[in-house]
Design a protein with these regions (language model features):
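Conserved beta-strand-loop-alpha-helix junction that forms the acyl-donor binding cleft
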Residues: 112-123, 141-145
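Conserved acetyl-CoA-binding loop-helix of GNAT-fold acetyltransferases
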Residues: 81, 87-101, 125-129
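Short hydrophobic/aromatic beta-strand or adjacent loop that forms the aromatic wall/cage
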Residues: 48, 145-150
């Protein structure tokens, strides 16, 4: 199955459905006060770029966003792949697209907050395989047992001709 990844607006019904599935997945993993959800409306803000993965039928099967906080700092947000494509490296391709865009924009660091526990083990493996290392809290995230924080120093920016469409076979 071929997967394509492109920058899209989050204000689409199938993307809203992905966000709902992500929220349902996260709900039992930590108390609500430690779930830092972005709504699709917040994801549509000009500081955020959303990548959507679609299968060969056009169905939205994954997403991940880059939120730019400053000229130096970006944050990975709302990473999710549908269970139907897990294990097919869709999450890795989404994360690579986010990292590439952060580098192209000249950011020096990419950080993320994710949950802890068994339900997040796959996510932690993805981030560490992609070069992210554990770190302490950043921005206004509190230090808690429910959060794990990761960082990827980006170094020298690279340029890519087309960051709006990426294919994964």
């Amino acid at each position: 199955m071929a997967i394509s990844i492109a920058v899209e607006t989050p204000l689409q019904d199938d993307v809203r459905a992905l966000v709902a599935r992500l929220n349902d997945h996260l709900l039992p993993l930590s108390p609500l006060e430690f779930q830092w959800k972005m709504t699709v409306e917040q994801m549509a803000d000009s500081s955020t770029t959303l990548f959507v993965a679609r299968d060969d039928t056009g169905a939205a099967v994954g997403m991940g966003a880059l939120k730019v906080h400053s000229p130096e700092l970006g944050e990975v947000k709302r990473m999710y792949t549908d269970v139907s494509v897990r294990g097919q490296r869709v999450g890795s391709a989404l994360l690579s697209a986010i990292v590439d865009l952060a580098r192209a924009r000249g950011l020096s660091s990419l950080m993320l907050e994710t949950g802890t526990g068994d339900g997040m083990a796959e996510a932690h493996r993805l981030y560490t395989r992609s070069g992210f290392t554990p770190r302490g809290p950043f921005l206004d995230y509190p230090d808690s047992q429910w959060s794990a924080f990761f960082e990827l120093p980006l170094g020298v920016p690279t340029s890519r001709d087309n960051l709006s469409e990426i294919s994964v076979d």
